[in-house]
């Protein structure tokens, strides 16, 4: 079990897939995304991400037919006027969970069910999980209104997240997102229509 502080300053790469990888968000034509009405809903909500919290910067993003990628920067606490650079040395320290006396700081310790539940409750209140929960809920609700399918699950339950710890990784991920429509036919999820 990964124990991270998802409110810590840093850079986060997030991917969220449509349930069963259905191509409902649009299609790629001439290496550009052409949004369906459902894709437009997701695009609109992605662009609202910075409104969710003053520390959030939506650095890069792309919506593809059956998933989206986000590159989100959480600024330093109390720092609201720019993008901070990745500090390779301190990035790991930022994400070590801050309850050093608890089980998650002890290597090879097997947590109890209660301890895992405690961490899960804390995690739900962290910025990134809260943001993703709101994004999934709002887009699903609006898509279901258009489809006349209330309560339908549109997103996979969990999303993939990666804390970026190196400047080189940040640059590679940013370029990957930018070039995703051009490389759509080589994408892992391309053939899962």
Give residue ranges: language-model regions:
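Short catalytic/metal-binding and nucleic-acid-binding patches
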Residues: 1-193
């Amino acid at each position: 079990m990964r124990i991270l502080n998802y409110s810590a300053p840093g850079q986060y790469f997030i991917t969220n897939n449509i349930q069963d990888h259905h191509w409902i968000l649009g299609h790629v034509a001439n290496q550009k995304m052409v949004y369906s009405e459902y894709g437009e809903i997701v695009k609109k909500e992605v662009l609202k991400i910075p409104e969710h919290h003053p520390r959030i910067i939506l650095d890069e993003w792309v919506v593809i037919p059956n998933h989206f990628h986000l590159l989100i920067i959480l600024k330093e606490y109390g720092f609201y006027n720019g993008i901070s650079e990745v500090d390779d040395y301190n990035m790991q320290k930022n994400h070590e969970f801050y309850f050093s006396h608890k089980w998650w700081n002890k290597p090879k310790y097997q947590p109890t069910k209660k301890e895992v539940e405690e961490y899960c409750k804390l995690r739900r209140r962290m910025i990134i999980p809260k943001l993703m929960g709101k994004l999934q809920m709002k887009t699903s609700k609006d898509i279901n209104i258009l489809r006349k399918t209330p309560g339908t699950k549109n997103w996979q339950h969990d999303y993939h997240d990666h804390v970026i710890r190196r400047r080189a990784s940040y640059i590679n991920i940013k370029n990957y997102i930018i070039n995703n429509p051009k490389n759509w036919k080589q994408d892992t999820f391309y053939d899962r229509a």
